Regions:
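Acidic/histidine-rich catalytic neighborhood of metal-dependent amide-processing enzymes
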Residues: 3-5, 10, 14-31, 35-110, ...
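Active-site-adjacent substrate-binding region
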Residues: 102-186, 191-196
């Protein structure tokens, strides 16, 4: 084939709407999260804020949290909380074992209470669940492997609870999402910024 170690190879990206509210494409992780944040930021009522809110986009999460760690080191203050917005790899696919990371698509975004690099304090979990419930937003609570950019803030003692959307077939050319989960995620991000 003429392909050698070190050669760059890419798959073409194509967003495909499926039946109902499902869509498939390559690289929803983390383009979908960026979209949810941008929509929340555009909808944010700046006059409603009585505290500082910072939205951060960083790079190289998959190869050592390079961007997030640099931001955490440079902020110069201690945020009350960090909510990394990232994929939640769901075990709700037909062939997956459903005893871990079971978060069905179309049933709302996911608050990550536990992963391989963090344990969210109970008060943060309860506060976020209360916020969502008070606004009738569906929110799933999940535990999974892996980690997020929020881990870059751990060394500073800053509590973090990643939030995201359930996704099947992560890091493949056919990642699968339910667009309703992204809409609710954007609403949740806006609520966190304005009210919590």
């Amino acid at each position: 084939l003429g392909v050698r170690i070190g050669d760059t190879v890419t798959n073409p990206k194509e967003f495909v709407r499926l039946a109902g509210t499902r869509a498939t494409a390559r690289s929803f992780d983390d383009r979908a999260g960026s979209t949810a944040q941008l929509v929340a930021l555009q909808s944010l009522d700046l006059n409603a804020l009585d505290h500082e809110v910072i939205f951060i986009w960083s790079t190289e999460e998959e190869v050592g949290l390079v961007g997030a760690t640099a931001v955490a080191d440079e902020l110069g203050f201690t945020p009350a909380r960090v909510h990394a917005v990232d994929t939640f790899v769901s075990s709700a696919a037909p062939v997956d074992r459903q005893n871990f990371a079971f978060t069905p698509l179309g049933q709302g975004p996911v608050a990550r209470g536990l992963d391989s690099s963090s344990v969210t304090p109970r008060a943060i979990i309860d506060g976020l669940l209360e916020l969502a419930d008070g606004h009738n937003l569906p929110l799933q609570l999940g535990a999974t492997n892996g980690g997020t950019d929020g881990t870059g803030f751990r060394d500073w003692g800053i509590p973090h609870m990643p939030i995201g959307w359930p996704l099947r077939y992560s890091h493949s050319p056919i990642e699968l999402i339910d667009l309703r989960d992204l809409v609710v995620l954007s609403d949740l991000i806006q609520l966190i910024a304005e009210e919590w």
